[in-house]
Amino acid sequence: GCYYIAFTRIGHFILASALHLYRTLGSGEEIFLHRNEAQDILPDCSPRLIDNLKDWSEPLKRAEVELEFCRNNNIRVLCLGDDNYPKRLEDCADAPLVMYYKGNANLNQSRVINIIGTRHCTTYGADFIRRFIHDLKALCPEVLVVSGLAYGVDINAHQQALAVGYETVGVVAHGLDYLYPAAHKAVAPEMVNHGGLLTEIMTRTNADKGHHN
């Protein structure tokens, strides 16, 4: 995972170009080994990115720090192409090269449902989520419920999933060195034990609005 993480730290990193390199060469290590040939593979790529690909010293140092944090905090690094990487994402045009996962749920189980919505959930909305998940449990005993751990609909979905015994995964827009919003710290440990927390963002990264898109 070190080369994958380092690759995402290259200056002027562009995901579309990165995915093209990955799909051409097959792994983060191969991208590193063929870094001086990137312009031949991506003739229309930004000259700045091509230049930055030649020097991996700082990105590799940052990747080692990230891996050490992951090892010390039971966080798994899921790289594109790994067996445990979410298969439903692999063919997406903007599939993350690296994801960080703390939890025990199988991200590739057969039944997965995403429940997301407004941060200003009404009483009616909260009751609808409760009834929907309880009815779903009666029909499908094994479902992974995925949401964004935000206020409103998201946190209601996670809490109701846990209430009926479903595993639930929160996809967050920040590194796993902290939790946002802090008000949801109480439910996060239960999610880690019965689901998980998933992100494509490294540690020491602010929860910017752009990461939620």
Model-derived regions, located:
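Short, positively charged patches
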Residues: 1-130, 134
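Glycine-biased, small-residue-rich flexible motifs in mid-sequence functional cores and linkers
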Residues: 79-213
